[in-house]
Amino acid sequence: AYYNAILWVITGKQAHADKAMEIIRAYAGTLKKIEGPDDPLCAGLQGAMLVNAAEVMRYTYTADKYAAGWNAEDTQKAESMFRNVFQPVLTTFYKTKPYTNGNWGIAVTKAQMAFGIFMNDRKLYEDAVEFFMKGHDNGTLPNYVAESGQIQESGRDQQHAMLGLGCLSEIAEMAWTQGQDLYSALDNRLMKGYEYLAKSNLGYEVPFFTWKDITGKYSNWTTLGEEGMGRFRALFEIAYNHYVERKGLEMPYTKIVLDMIRPEGPGFTCDNPGFGSLLFYLGKDLNAGQKPGRIDEDLSRHEGWTFTGCSYKSVDNVMSFVSSGVSMQKKRISYQAGSYPYIAVKAPRIPASINKDWLQLSYSVASAPEFWKLDADKAQKVGEDIYVFKVTDALSNNGTRFTERPTNIT
């Protein structure tokens, strides 16, 4: 429902509006209860997505302009669902003795604030703000992000730390639209969390201490969690936009991450909304001076590229650095082969022993990745170091001809 609502606003295609309405009405007309051991997470994460979809449709697809548009009955049924099905789960969580990692409480607060805004319920909203700042739980700003920027779940793994921090920024963004600044709370504590998360996941050393959490159950992590390290989710743009574009502050490590992953893609399941470059970025045109669909990449600079190289292993009982070759790749490059069928690569130092298909392109076909290996021996040589490949003649590993339509490639 949420993504169809966004697509409706962007494209103006009524099919997306009708699908969003169909989904919202189906839930509002049938959902009676949310239960299970993870019900606060379900009500928090999925509830936040659903109420945001309802918020968009309520004010952009109205019954006075569209026959199937949002009407008074939709408001009544949606509010009844949020108040009588979702909200009791959130209220129970707030009243229960703390028992979870912080991302649970943050997800609950994200949904409650969104419900309060949708239903014009000031108490729900203010209670969410109170919990965000002062709640007795791991899921509050001071209890989730330390002064150093370390996150309560940094020692657990990186995906949960990203989930929690992303939800905190969504709370701050909602409050900002209501005229309240939670971003600046505790001397820009949220910004410090982002910089710590970005810096540590980029491989830089950061200070780490064993966290004493509210529950006492999660106080035995003595190092940064390795799981998920360096796998950046789509949740950095929202905070970067506020602190850098709105406030003129600096987030150097977050900028490095965004240079690698822009434009941000979808969120992970329903954890965070994703597509932050589309939804939140308010800076200068990132494509200014570029021709749509034309690749213009500087291979000598690290921005956006990931590398694999040597590893440290035993050779004849001696620990040695061993390399089977160095590879580099960059994801989500916008390319349109129909307009630019040739790719020229300036590569002055290619070893004679390297495989001739050192340039490979890939994108998904029918939800599965396919790969196009371009033969350097068949490339047109310009001078000593420029190879010109014709992409539209290439066939994939499955025999598929490279598309001429705009697509994001690796």
Predicted regions: what is each one?
Residues C310-V315:
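Transition segment at domain starts
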Residues N317-G399:
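Extracellular ligand-binding interfaces
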Residues G47, N103, T109-K110, R294, ...:
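Extracellular structured ligand-interaction cores
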Residues S396-T410:
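Noncatalytic modules at the cell exterior or secretory-pathway interfaces
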Residues Q178, K192, I214-K291:
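Terminal, non-catalytic domain-edge segments
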Residues N287-G309:
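Extracellular carbohydrate-recognition regions
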Residues A1-G179, D187:
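Aromatic-lined, polymer-binding surfaces characteristic
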Residues I151-R231:
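Active-site/pore-lining binding-face segments in mid-to-C-terminal subdomains
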